[in-house]
Regions:
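Internal alpha-helical scaffold of NAD(P)-dependent oxidoreductase catalytic cores
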Residues: 2-81
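A generic membrane alpha-helix/interface feature
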Residues: 46, 114-115, 140
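Interdomain hinge/lid region at the active-site interface
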Residues: 66-133
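Short, charge-rich amphipathic alpha-helical segments embedded
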Residues: 135-141
């Protein structure tokens, strides 16, 4: 398994943590990451919940009704996780509401920076923003 096993030990005894680490290794997890509950919740908001927020917001556009024949890989890639179990994800979002609200604000700020550059016809700023995003993706995956 290439994926990581995330362990939030909290106040668990070391023996319990050791047992979970052994289990994760026996299952073939490639990496075992330790973190606090707060770090876990922040990273889940960023890595899992924000993509669902983005996909759902994206397909809520009236253009979604008309996309057939115009869309290809980009549409499919961004919208895939909008096929959501609404009951489950509403509970997950609300259980992590503070972290998700903060991450959503960050996403909106970044979208606004791109929107402003487009609206101002500011090619230099747009290239800088897009280049910065590409560099981050290349560096961090």
């Amino acid at each position: 398994i290439r994926d990581s096993y995330i362990l939030v030990p909290g106040e668990a005894p070391q023996s319990a943590t050791d047992t979970l680490v052994s289990l994760a290794k026996s299952m073939g997890f490639g990496t075992i990451k330790y973190c606090t509950q707060q770090k876990h919740d922040r990273m889940i908001a960023y890595t899992s919940q924000i993509p669902h927020v983005l996909a759902c917001a994206y397909v809520m556009s009236p253009r979604c009704d008309e996309h057939s024949g115009f869309s290809a890989g980009s549409y499919r890639d961004v919208s895939r996780v909008a096929r959501i179990n609404a009951e489950l994800w509403a509970d997950l979002f609300l259980a992590n509401r503070e972290e998700l609200a903060d991450e959503t604000e960050e996403l909106v700020r970044n979208i606004e920076r791109i929107r402003a550059a487009v609206a101002k016809n500011d090619r230099a700023e747009l290239v800088a923003l897009l280049s910065s995003a590409r560099e981050k993706k290349e560096k961090f995956g």
